[in-house]
């Protein structure tokens, strides 16, 4: 399988899967996403890590933190101020009748460019430079109801694999040894995530109970 990641820059939303395979090669892995498409993951060269979202044999999403894309004029290592001078980041996303306020702590911006949403990620420790981006068609993005996906084992495993890839791309950039998969570490991380989720749910419930109690006292 000959991989040519330099051709990734020419892949665009709407291209077909055959074009992708013929230009950059077969993926190292195919992951589930929180949307209806699957990520074709290219991680053989971590300095040129990229993912292509494929739905019904067509490209609906692109991600990279190592290669620019001709689909957008935002380039890696650009400054956040430069991006914001050119585009106005979205302040909220509307899902049905609900508006979800975007509060990114200046770590990313979501831009509306043509028929796509573009999420631009910034490295707040490196002069707020663009360190990655995700392009997704509005049609593909609309398949997610709300902001957060429904969890399942396959999606969890995909997120875990992608997290390891992203950590290793950063380690590669900083000339550090890459991390290998550890079942023990994965089990520990899952347990920690479950504990945190339970704590968050409890905090939300406690807040709701307090609000209800205050309202009940006022009525009395």
Residue ranges and their predicted role:
Residues 1-220:
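Functional surface patches built around histidine and acidic residues
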């Amino acid at each position: 399988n000959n991989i040519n990641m330099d051709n990734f820059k020419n892949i665009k939303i709407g291209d077909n899967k055959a074009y992708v395979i013929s230009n950059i090669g077969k993926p190292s892995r195919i992951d589930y996403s929180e949307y209806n498409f699957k990520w074709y993951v290219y991680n053989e060269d971590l300095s040129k890590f990229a993912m292509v979202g494929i739905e019904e044999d067509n490209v609906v999403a692109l991600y990279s933190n190592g290669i620019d894309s001709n689909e957008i004029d935002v380039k890696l290592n650009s400054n956040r101020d430069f991006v914001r001078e050119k585009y106005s980041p979205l302040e909220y996303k509307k899902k049905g009748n609900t508006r979800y306020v975007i509060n990114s702590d200046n770590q990313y911006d979501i831009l509306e460019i043509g028929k796509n949403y573009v999420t631009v990620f910034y490295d707040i420790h490196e002069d707020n430079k663009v360190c990655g981006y995700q392009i997704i068609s509005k049609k593909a993005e609309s398949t997610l109801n709300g902001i957060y996906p429904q969890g399942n084992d396959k999606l969890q495993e995909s997120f875990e694999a992608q997290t390891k890839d992203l950590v290793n791309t950063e380690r590669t950039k900083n000339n550090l040894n890459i991390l290998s998969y550890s079942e023990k570490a994965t089990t520990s991380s899952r347990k920690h995530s479950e504990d945190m989720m339970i704590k968050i749910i409890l905090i939300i419930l406690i807040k709701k109970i307090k609000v209800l109690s205050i309202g009940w006292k006022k009525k009395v």
